[in-house]
Amino acid sequence: MIRRVRVTVRVSRACRPHHVRIFVAKIVQALCRASASINQGTPFQVLLIVRKKRHRGRSGHDDGQCTPGSNPVAVRGGTQHPRPDNPHPASPRRCPGGLPGHSDAAPSGRGAAGCQGLLGSPACGPRRGTRTPPRGRIPARGGEGRLNDTVQEAQ
């Protein structure tokens, strides 16, 4: 059985006032009780129809959001670092010489860092064993601690 349903939709948007749309939708509905589980999909069918009819003329605007202007959002094609005070050049993240601003970095591709499952970029932090100790503490490594002990014994 085809059932005609009157659907009233109140569309709320971030940058425009609410507006109401009313239309008639045709929904196929099961007649027998054995296939009553098909009838539970009726709200889902209504939502699909509402989404299709909401912005029929405009493609890509089916989630209720809108851009500040009337033009669709342009593809990001500007430089990666638009600020003038940024020390890194405006180049792709990985270029043939490695990471921008790091001449001793691994060449493009995953390299040894990729084999370990790490990104290998400076954002991951310094490599193991290169961190500076916290202020006011002497690092507890083998050679440095013994050096301080021998200096105290000699005095």
UniProtKB/Swiss-Prot annotation:
One of its GO terms (biological process) is protein K63-linked ubiquitination. Pfam families: P19Arf_N. Residues 125-141 have a biased composition (Low complexity). It is found in: Nucleus, Nucleolus; Nucleus, Nucleoplasm. Changing residue 126 to L: In some primary melanomas and melanoma cell lines. Residues 55-155 are annotated as: Disordered. Ubiquitously expressed. In the testis, expressed in both somatic and germ cells. Not detected in premeiotic spermatogonia but expressed in both meiotic and postmeiotic cells. In primary tumors, low levels detected in melanocytic hyperplasias. Higher levels found in non-metastatic and metastatic melanomas. InterPro entries: Tumor_suppres_ARF. Ubiquitinated in normal cells by TRIP12 via the ubiquitin fusion degradation (UFD) pathway, a process that mediates ubiquitination at the N-terminus, regardless of the absence of lysine residues. Ubiquitination leads to its proteasomal degradation. In cancer cells, however, TRIP12 is located in a different cell compartment, preventing ubiquitination and degradation. One of its GO terms (molecular function) is DNA binding. Keywords: Apoptosis, Cell cycle, DNA-binding, Nucleus, rRNA processing, Transcription, Transcription regulation, Tumor suppressor, Ubl conjugation, Ubl conjugation pathway. Does not interact with cyclins, CDK1, CDK2, CDK4, CDK5 or CDK6. Binds to BCL6, E2F1, HUWE1, MDM2, MYC, NPM1/B23, TOP1/TOPOI and UBE2I/UBC9. Interacts with TBRG1 and COMMD1. Interacts with CDKN2AIP and E4F1. Interacts with CDK5RAP3 and MDM2; form a ternary complex involved in regulation of p53/TP53. Interacts with NOP53; the interaction is direct and promotes ARF nucleoplasmic relocalization and ubiquitin-mediated proteasomal degradation. Interacts with TTF1 (via the N-terminal region (NRD) and a C-terminal region); the interaction is direct and inhibits the nucleolar localization of TTF1. Capable of inducing cell cycle arrest in G1 and G2 phases. Acts as a tumor suppressor. Binds to MDM2 and blocks its nucleocytoplasmic shuttling by sequestering it in the nucleolus. This inhibits the oncogenic action of MDM2 by blocking MDM2-induced degradation of p53 and enhancing p53-dependent transactivation and apoptosis. Also induces G2 arrest and apoptosis in a p53-independent manner by preventing the activation of cyclin B1/CDC2 complexes. Binds to BCL6 and down-regulates BCL6-induced transcriptional repression. This is Tumor suppressor ARF. It comes from Monodelphis domestica (Gray short-tailed opossum).
